[in-house]
Amino acid sequence: MTYPKRIPLNAWSDALKAAKPLIITFDAYNTLYATKLPVMEQYCIVGHKYGIKANPLTLTKNFPHVFKKLKENYPQYGKFSNIGPEEWWSSLIKNVFAPIEIPDEMVSEILLRFEGFDSYFVYPDLINFLKNVKARYPNIILGIISNTDPIFYKLLKNIGLYETFADNIYLSYELDLAKPDKAIFEYAFNDIIDKRPDLLKVYSKEEICQHCFHIGDELKNDLEGAEGAGWTGILLDRNDKYGYLSESLDKTVRDEYKLSLDKIDNHSIKTWETSSKQTDTIQLNKKKYVVSNLEVLEELFP
């Protein structure tokens, strides 16, 4: 087969489908959920209540440098620097607004806003995908592998997704491992097998690996990270930011600056409207796929 291969929605056949899924893990931010409005617009909405006049475009320009510096000075959200994740994010918020000084009460309100549906939107296709995949494969194991901090648990509970993934959540902060390193995928794999030894009565570990899938929105961390661990990687590219779906492959290289902006510049409702119209799947090789939405992805499985 020649790659990359474009597979229209009406062209799927048994020969094109992947293996039956036993384990599916997801990235978190911009995969399970995303911001309703760009992050800096939301910061400014809160700021307005406190008399702070700031331009979202200016804050957006400030963000990549502030984010990069904090990650370098206080890696893993401050875990090794005697500061907690909330203090780490508070510092980010204050530095993004600098030189404007903002009150602590405003910082607290911004943090609270980003703990649930005030800020976030859960894509409708995710809810349908989870429902359908559990109906088709009652013993499917669902999990999360994310480079994030424990504040995530509060958010996941508030948006109603915690119970779906509760037994299999793997965070970089807690494990001192991070995507795209295959070690975090291997840790998740071995932990799941330890919890579900019944799988080894039917499959070898090598065989189980052929039935593992990871879904996420970043090329390096999710698609290539999963492939490096022997899993099938699925790039969920709702905005075609990497260019595979439109065959604009000059877009595939995204540096740290662009990736930083991806984290804050999403308008998820508009993104959903756009992504739901794209129904092709791009297969890059036997272990890598690109889709625009999860409705399309259901066709991948037998």
Residue ranges, per PLM feature:
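Asp-based, Mg2+/Mn2+-dependent phosphohydrolase catalytic module
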Residues: M1-L22, I127, K131, G143-P302
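N-terminal helical cap/lid subdomain that shapes the substrate entry/recognition surface
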Residues: T2-N128, K134-P138, L142, P150-K154
